[in-house]
Protein backbone atom coordinates (compact mmCIF):
# COMPACT_ATOMS: atom_id res chain seq x y z
CA UNK A 1 0.00 0.00 0.00
CA UNK A 2 1.07 3.57 -0.69
CA UNK A 3 -0.39 6.92 0.28
CA UNK A 4 -0.63 9.98 -1.97
CA UNK A 5 -1.15 13.48 -0.56
CA UNK A 6 -2.68 15.90 -3.06
CA UNK A 7 -3.04 19.59 -2.22
CA UNK A 8 -5.94 21.46 -3.82
CA UNK A 9 -5.48 25.16 -3.02
CA UNK A 10 -8.62 26.48 -4.70
CA UNK A 11 -10.86 24.80 -2.11
CA UNK A 12 -8.20 24.74 0.63
CA UNK A 13 -8.01 20.97 1.07
CA UNK A 14 -5.50 18.14 1.19
CA UNK A 15 -6.78 14.83 -0.19
CA UNK A 16 -5.30 11.63 1.20
CA UNK A 17 -5.50 8.69 -1.22
CA UNK A 18 -4.49 5.08 -0.59
CA UNK A 19 -3.20 3.01 -3.50
CA UNK A 20 -3.62 -0.75 -3.39
CA UNK A 21 -0.71 -1.85 -5.55
CA UNK A 22 -2.14 -5.30 -6.27
CA UNK A 23 -5.72 -4.30 -7.06
CA UNK A 24 -4.54 -1.07 -8.72
CA UNK A 25 -7.22 0.84 -6.83
CA UNK A 26 -7.20 4.35 -5.37
CA UNK A 27 -9.32 4.93 -2.28
CA UNK A 28 -9.98 8.32 -0.68
CA UNK A 29 -9.02 8.01 2.99
CA UNK A 30 -9.21 11.57 4.34
CA UNK A 31 -9.93 15.17 3.35
CA UNK A 32 -8.11 17.76 5.44
CA UNK A 33 -9.19 21.42 5.51
CA UNK A 34 -6.32 23.91 5.45
CA UNK A 35 -6.19 27.45 6.77
CA UNK A 36 -5.35 28.97 3.41
CA UNK A 37 -4.30 27.68 0.00
CA UNK A 38 -2.18 24.54 0.37
CA UNK A 39 0.43 24.29 -2.36
CA UNK A 40 3.89 22.65 -2.10
CA UNK A 41 4.13 19.53 0.04
CA UNK A 42 6.99 17.29 1.13
CA UNK A 43 7.24 14.17 3.31
CA UNK A 44 9.96 13.96 5.97
CA UNK A 45 12.58 11.26 5.23
CA UNK A 46 11.42 9.32 8.32
CA UNK A 47 7.92 9.36 6.76
CA UNK A 48 6.33 10.54 10.01
CA UNK A 49 5.59 14.14 8.97
CA UNK A 50 4.11 16.06 6.04
CA UNK A 51 5.01 19.72 5.51
CA UNK A 52 2.65 21.96 3.55
CA UNK A 53 3.30 25.46 2.22
CA UNK A 54 0.34 27.80 2.71
CA UNK A 55 -0.67 31.04 0.97
CA UNK A 56 -1.61 33.91 1.15
CA UNK A 57 -0.82 34.06 4.88
CA UNK A 58 2.67 32.69 4.34
CA UNK A 59 3.45 29.70 6.56
CA UNK A 60 4.39 26.04 6.59
CA UNK A 61 2.01 23.66 8.36
CA UNK A 62 3.36 20.45 9.88
CA UNK A 63 1.22 17.31 10.01
CA UNK A 64 1.93 14.13 11.89
CA UNK A 65 1.40 11.04 9.74
CA UNK A 66 -0.31 8.11 11.46
CA UNK A 67 0.53 4.45 10.88
CA UNK A 68 -2.20 4.27 8.23
CA UNK A 69 -1.13 7.50 6.53
CA UNK A 70 -3.72 9.89 7.95
CA UNK A 71 -2.84 13.46 8.89
CA UNK A 72 -3.06 15.45 12.12
CA UNK A 73 -1.89 19.06 12.17
CA UNK A 74 0.62 19.73 14.96
CA UNK A 75 2.26 23.05 14.04
CA UNK A 76 1.94 26.17 11.92
CA UNK A 77 5.11 28.19 11.29
CA UNK A 78 5.02 31.71 9.88
CA UNK A 79 7.49 32.49 7.11
CA UNK A 80 8.30 35.75 5.34
CA UNK A 81 7.88 34.58 1.75
CA UNK A 82 5.35 32.84 -0.48
CA UNK A 83 6.16 29.09 -0.59
CA UNK A 84 6.62 27.62 -4.07
CA UNK A 85 8.65 24.45 -3.50
CA UNK A 86 9.79 22.48 -0.44
CA UNK A 87 12.81 20.18 -0.17
CA UNK A 88 14.23 18.39 2.89
CA UNK A 89 17.79 17.14 3.25
CA UNK A 90 18.24 13.37 3.56
CA UNK A 91 18.85 13.60 7.30
CA UNK A 92 15.55 15.39 7.89
CA UNK A 93 17.23 18.25 9.74
CA UNK A 94 16.62 21.19 7.38
CA UNK A 95 13.87 22.25 5.01
CA UNK A 96 14.56 24.49 2.01
CA UNK A 97 11.60 26.66 1.04
CA UNK A 98 11.80 28.21 -2.42
CA UNK A 99 9.79 31.33 -3.25
CA UNK A 100 9.28 32.19 -6.91
CA UNK A 101 7.51 35.49 -6.18
CA UNK A 102 10.05 36.57 -3.55
CA UNK A 103 13.10 35.29 -5.50
CA UNK A 104 14.68 33.48 -2.58
CA UNK A 105 15.44 30.25 -0.72
CA UNK A 106 14.58 30.13 2.98
CA UNK A 107 16.56 27.64 5.11
CA UNK A 108 14.64 26.41 8.17
CA UNK A 109 15.87 24.00 10.84
CA UNK A 110 13.81 20.91 11.75
CA UNK A 111 14.18 19.73 15.35
CA UNK A 112 14.36 16.11 16.53
CA UNK A 113 10.58 16.04 16.98
CA UNK A 114 9.93 17.01 13.35
CA UNK A 115 8.91 20.56 14.25
CA UNK A 116 10.12 23.63 12.37
CA UNK A 117 12.34 26.17 14.11
CA UNK A 118 13.17 29.70 13.03
CA UNK A 119 14.66 30.54 9.66
CA UNK A 120 18.45 30.43 9.79
CA UNK A 121 19.28 31.81 6.33
CA UNK A 122 17.60 33.45 3.35
CA UNK A 123 19.35 33.48 -0.03
CA UNK A 124 17.94 36.44 -1.98
CA UNK A 125 18.12 37.84 -5.52
CA UNK A 126 17.40 34.54 -7.25
CA UNK A 127 15.05 35.71 -9.97
CA UNK A 128 12.19 33.30 -10.51
CA UNK A 129 13.73 30.61 -8.32
CA UNK A 130 11.36 27.67 -8.79
CA UNK A 131 12.74 24.55 -7.10
CA UNK A 132 15.47 23.21 -4.83
CA UNK A 133 17.04 19.88 -5.72
CA UNK A 134 19.71 17.83 -3.94
CA UNK A 135 21.65 15.30 -6.00
CA UNK A 136 22.68 11.83 -4.86
CA UNK A 137 25.88 12.85 -3.05
CA UNK A 138 23.76 15.08 -0.76
CA UNK A 139 26.36 17.85 -0.79
CA UNK A 140 25.06 20.30 -3.40
CA UNK A 141 21.70 22.00 -3.84
CA UNK A 142 20.65 22.92 -7.39
CA UNK A 143 18.18 25.79 -7.82
CA UNK A 144 16.74 26.54 -11.28
CA UNK A 145 16.02 30.27 -11.64
CA UNK A 146 13.40 30.59 -14.31
CA UNK A 147 13.68 34.33 -14.96
CA UNK A 148 17.50 34.25 -15.06
CA UNK A 149 17.78 31.24 -17.38
CA UNK A 150 20.27 29.80 -14.91
CA UNK A 151 20.67 26.96 -12.45
CA UNK A 152 22.41 28.09 -9.26
CA UNK A 153 24.52 25.62 -7.28
CA UNK A 154 25.13 25.78 -3.52
CA UNK A 155 27.28 23.75 -1.15
CA UNK A 156 25.27 22.44 1.81
CA UNK A 157 26.71 22.66 5.30
CA UNK A 158 25.34 19.41 6.73
CA UNK A 159 25.85 20.52 10.32
CA UNK A 160 24.21 23.93 10.09
CA UNK A 161 22.14 23.51 6.91
CA UNK A 162 23.33 26.79 5.46
CA UNK A 163 24.14 27.34 1.80
CA UNK A 164 27.15 28.95 0.16
CA UNK A 165 27.87 29.33 -3.56
CA UNK A 166 29.41 26.26 -5.13
CA UNK A 167 32.28 26.59 -7.60
CA UNK A 168 31.10 26.82 -10.32
CA UNK A 169 28.02 28.62 -9.04
CA UNK A 170 25.95 28.94 -12.22
CA UNK A 171 24.88 26.80 -15.16
CA UNK A 172 23.54 28.93 -18.01
CA UNK A 173 20.64 27.68 -20.10
CA UNK A 174 19.34 29.16 -23.35
CA UNK A 175 17.81 32.63 -23.31
CA UNK A 176 14.05 32.55 -22.75
CA UNK A 177 14.21 28.89 -21.76
CA UNK A 178 13.04 29.18 -18.14
CA UNK A 179 14.56 26.27 -16.17
CA UNK A 180 11.96 25.10 -13.66
CA UNK A 181 12.14 21.57 -12.20
CA UNK A 182 14.80 18.84 -12.19
CA UNK A 183 15.31 15.12 -11.84
CA UNK A 184 18.55 13.25 -11.15
CA UNK A 185 19.77 9.88 -12.35
CA UNK A 186 20.00 7.89 -9.13
CA UNK A 187 23.28 6.07 -9.83
CA UNK A 188 25.18 8.17 -12.39
CA UNK A 189 26.14 11.84 -12.56
CA UNK A 190 23.39 13.18 -14.80
CA UNK A 191 20.69 15.78 -14.22
CA UNK A 192 17.60 16.47 -16.32
CA UNK A 193 16.05 19.96 -16.32
CA UNK A 194 12.66 20.89 -17.77
CA UNK A 195 12.50 24.41 -19.20
CA UNK A 196 9.08 26.02 -18.86
CA UNK A 197 9.17 28.51 -21.73
CA UNK A 198 10.65 26.53 -24.63
CA UNK A 199 9.62 22.97 -23.75
CA UNK A 200 13.20 21.70 -23.82
CA UNK A 201 14.89 19.20 -21.51
CA UNK A 202 18.54 19.97 -20.79
CA UNK A 203 20.65 16.91 -19.97
CA UNK A 204 23.59 17.84 -17.74
CA UNK A 205 26.62 15.62 -17.16
CA UNK A 206 28.89 16.34 -14.19
CA UNK A 207 31.84 14.80 -12.38
CA UNK A 208 31.87 13.54 -8.79
CA UNK A 209 32.99 16.86 -7.34
CA UNK A 210 30.50 18.75 -9.54
CA UNK A 211 33.30 20.99 -10.78
CA UNK A 212 32.99 20.04 -14.44
CA UNK A 213 29.47 20.37 -15.80
CA UNK A 214 28.24 20.29 -19.38
CA UNK A 215 24.87 20.33 -21.07
CA UNK A 216 25.27 17.35 -23.39
CA UNK A 217 21.78 17.34 -24.93
CA UNK A 218 18.83 19.64 -25.51
CA UNK A 219 15.70 17.84 -26.63
CA UNK A 220 12.21 19.25 -27.17
CA UNK A 221 9.35 17.51 -25.43
CA UNK A 222 6.86 17.88 -28.30
CA UNK A 223 7.40 20.12 -31.32
CA UNK A 224 9.90 17.90 -33.10
CA UNK A 225 7.87 14.81 -32.44
CA UNK A 226 4.60 15.22 -34.32
CA UNK A 227 2.81 17.96 -32.36
CA UNK A 228 3.18 21.36 -33.98
CA UNK A 229 3.16 23.96 -31.23
CA UNK A 230 5.09 27.17 -30.81
CA UNK A 231 4.05 27.75 -27.20
CA UNK A 232 5.00 25.80 -24.11
CA UNK A 233 4.14 25.92 -20.43
CA UNK A 234 6.11 22.95 -19.20
CA UNK A 235 5.74 22.07 -15.54
CA UNK A 236 7.20 18.89 -14.07
CA UNK A 237 9.70 16.09 -14.69
CA UNK A 238 10.32 12.69 -13.07
CA UNK A 239 12.33 9.49 -13.63
CA UNK A 240 11.35 5.92 -12.78
CA UNK A 241 13.34 4.34 -9.92
CA UNK A 242 15.16 2.03 -12.35
CA UNK A 243 16.41 5.08 -14.34
CA UNK A 244 14.94 3.70 -17.55
CA UNK A 245 12.05 6.08 -18.31
CA UNK A 246 11.68 9.85 -17.99
CA UNK A 247 8.39 11.74 -18.14
CA UNK A 248 7.59 15.44 -18.35
CA UNK A 249 4.35 17.43 -18.42
CA UNK A 250 3.21 20.53 -20.30
CA UNK A 251 0.24 22.64 -19.20
CA UNK A 252 -0.35 24.45 -22.49
CA UNK A 253 -0.61 21.26 -24.54
CA UNK A 254 -2.02 19.13 -21.66
CA UNK A 255 0.47 16.36 -22.37
CA UNK A 256 2.84 13.94 -20.73
CA UNK A 257 5.89 13.08 -22.83
CA UNK A 258 7.84 9.84 -22.48
CA UNK A 259 11.57 9.42 -23.06
CA UNK A 260 13.91 6.47 -22.75
CA UNK A 261 17.15 7.14 -20.87
CA UNK A 262 19.77 5.47 -23.04
CA UNK A 263 21.88 3.01 -21.09
CA UNK A 264 25.32 3.98 -22.37
CA UNK A 265 25.12 7.76 -22.79
CA UNK A 266 22.24 8.65 -20.42
CA UNK A 267 20.90 10.89 -23.18
CA UNK A 268 17.19 10.91 -23.95
CA UNK A 269 15.34 9.20 -26.78
CA UNK A 270 11.82 10.45 -27.43
CA UNK A 271 9.20 7.67 -27.38
CA UNK A 272 5.77 9.33 -27.46
CA UNK A 273 3.36 11.65 -25.71
CA UNK A 274 -0.22 11.34 -24.47
CA UNK A 275 -2.93 13.84 -23.68
CA UNK A 276 -3.78 14.00 -20.00
CA UNK A 277 -5.68 16.15 -17.49
CA UNK A 278 -6.22 19.83 -18.26
CA UNK A 279 -3.26 21.86 -17.03
CA UNK A 280 -1.11 19.11 -15.48
CA UNK A 281 0.69 21.19 -12.85
CA UNK A 282 2.20 18.23 -11.01
CA UNK A 283 2.65 14.49 -11.32
CA UNK A 284 4.55 11.80 -9.48
CA UNK A 285 5.90 8.30 -10.02
CA UNK A 286 5.37 5.85 -7.17
CA UNK A 287 8.20 4.10 -5.34
CA UNK A 288 7.72 0.84 -7.27
CA UNK A 289 7.97 2.54 -10.66
CA UNK A 290 4.72 0.88 -11.71
CA UNK A 291 2.35 3.83 -11.37
CA UNK A 292 2.18 7.49 -12.36
CA UNK A 293 -0.40 9.90 -10.94
CA UNK A 294 -1.10 13.31 -12.45
CA UNK A 295 -3.11 16.27 -11.11
CA UNK A 296 -5.13 18.49 -13.45
CA UNK A 297 -5.20 22.02 -12.10
CA UNK A 298 -8.03 23.04 -14.46
CA UNK A 299 -9.88 19.72 -14.78
CA UNK A 300 -9.97 19.28 -10.97
CA UNK A 301 -9.33 15.56 -11.47
CA UNK A 302 -6.43 13.20 -10.93
CA UNK A 303 -5.59 10.24 -13.18
CA UNK A 304 -3.76 7.09 -12.14
CA UNK A 305 -1.72 5.42 -14.88
CA UNK A 306 0.06 2.10 -15.06
CA UNK A 307 3.64 2.30 -16.34
CA UNK A 308 4.39 -0.61 -18.65
CA UNK A 309 7.85 -1.84 -17.70
CA UNK A 310 8.85 -3.06 -21.16
CA UNK A 311 8.20 0.17 -23.07
CA UNK A 312 7.33 2.90 -20.54
CA UNK A 313 3.92 3.51 -22.05
CA UNK A 314 1.11 4.77 -19.83
CA UNK A 315 -2.37 3.27 -19.64
CA UNK A 316 -5.23 4.77 -17.64
CA UNK A 317 -6.32 2.82 -14.57
CA UNK A 318 -8.76 5.28 -13.00
CA UNK A 319 -9.75 8.92 -12.74
CA UNK A 320 -11.03 10.73 -9.65
CA UNK A 321 -12.25 14.16 -8.57
CA UNK A 322 -9.78 15.66 -6.08
CA UNK A 323 -10.97 19.08 -5.02
CA UNK A 324 -10.47 22.35 -6.87
CA UNK A 325 -7.21 23.08 -8.61
CA UNK A 326 -5.13 20.07 -7.49
CA UNK A 327 -1.46 20.93 -7.87
CA UNK A 328 1.02 19.12 -5.64
CA UNK A 329 1.48 15.41 -5.04
CA UNK A 330 3.63 13.77 -2.36
CA UNK A 331 3.95 10.06 -1.66
CA UNK A 332 4.29 7.95 1.47
CA UNK A 333 5.56 4.38 1.19
CA UNK A 334 5.64 2.55 4.53
CA UNK A 335 5.60 -1.14 5.27
CA UNK A 336 3.28 -0.39 8.17
CA UNK A 337 0.45 0.98 6.02
CA UNK A 338 -2.49 -1.37 6.07
Swiss-Prot record:
Single biological process term from Gene Ontology: glucose metabolic process
Keyword Repressor: no
Assigned GO CC terms: cytosol
Pfam families recorded: Lactonase
Catalytic activity: 6-phospho-D-glucono-1,5-lactone + H2O = 6-phospho-D-gluconate + H(+)
This protein's record includes keyword RNA-binding: no
NCBIfam families the UniProt entry points to: PRK11028.1
Entry protein name: 6-phosphogluconolactonase
Gene: pgl
